[in-house]
Amino acid sequence: DAFKDVDFTARLTKKDLEILRDVPEEAVKLALLDILGEPEVQKDWGGEQCDIWTDRITIDGGRHQAAFALKGPAKFHPMTVSDLGKNGDQIARLAHTAADLLVVQHCHTVKAEVVEMLRTYALRPGHVRRYMVLNGYDTLRILRHFGKV
């Protein structure tokens, strides 16, 4: 529900996407935490399960837990599985949380193989949950809507 008023149909260009080249991952993280009303800032370290853990997500009025994996401009190119941690296991780590919603956010486009991997983990029998991909265009729309860029 936090993003319900964001216009995800607004047309953006590759030139617009370049804005995110200079926005550090930490700035996106802090902006998302603020938008979600999450006061806890998790420290980054290499083997973390997620970059953001929150129970302040609401979907259709109901409260849910969400785990976010964020990828900033150090990898300013279309996201592939190899960009997801040293062993390509960041989505697997994300999926090992108790989150009801798994979110992958990137500052650029996201390749289909990443979306398929996220979908596979999210729809795992016995622990089905929602998933969301925020590519660079979606991220920019959110940040602009909330006056963060």
Task: Show where each model-derived region lies.
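Mixed-charge (Asp/Glu-Lys/Arg
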Residues: D1-V149
